[in-house]
């Protein structure tokens, strides 16, 4: 069955394995996860739990700032006897009977050796050319060449007479939702609500990440 939790990417470090191998790991802090709602097949058409992460400030009349919860969000969180949450996600394909509304989801949901998928928003790189953005090759840099880092041909002339949608061109790079699959949980620190994940995960430091059981290897 699927397991899931939300957290913040703290950064990277290194730990030693049992055999003395040096392992690069990403530190993810995953505290303050609370079940806000249970969804069942009878009522909602599918089974899922809705999890909230990080407290948001209570409703403030007249304020339009995102740091304050609105009244519907405050009322929704009140049913779970908790504060309004900044981030809310659903996790499906799990046994909803194991969860109760208001229950805290802690890092011990996962164990050392679990294979997981990690989803985050990739680092924004701003406007970049085709070489950095798509890995295209460059032209000769000498011998009279006038073609260095330009994209090259982007379409045909008379027949089609247009640039097709999806053509790889310069543009804004990064800031996309990215999932890295089949990463391994190296260590779970319940005292500090921290999970150590082997390798790197998407996003900058302090970026939101979603950890779920691997969709490909989780049930093996």
UniProtKB/Swiss-Prot annotation:
InterPro entries reported in the protein's UniProt record: Ribosomal_uL3 (IPR000597), Ribosomal_uL3_bac/org-type (IPR019927), Ribosomal_uL3_CS (IPR019926), Transl_B-barrel_sf (IPR009000)
Region annotated Disordered, chain positions: 61-81
Coiled-coil residue windows: none
Record's keyword annotation contains Flavoprotein: no
Record flagged with keyword GTP-binding: no
GO terms, molecular function: rRNA binding; structural constituent of ribosome
Paired cysteines (S-S): none
Keyword vocabulary terms for this entry: Ribonucleoprotein, Ribosomal protein, RNA-binding, rRNA-binding
Gene Ontology BP annotations: translation
Classification via Pfam families: Ribosomal_L3
GO CC entries: cytosolic large ribosomal subunit
Role according to the record: One of the primary rRNA binding proteins, it binds directly near the 3'-end of the 23S rRNA, where it nucleates assembly of the 50S subunit.
Record's subunit section: Part of the 50S ribosomal subunit. Forms a cluster with proteins L14 and L19.
NCBIfam families given in the database record: L3_bact (TIGR03625)
The family this protein is said to belong to: Belongs to the universal ribosomal protein uL3 family.
The protein's name: Large ribosomal subunit protein uL3
Organism: Staphylococcus epidermidis (strain ATCC 35984 / DSM 28319 / BCRC 17069 / CCUG 31568 / BM 3577 / RP62A)
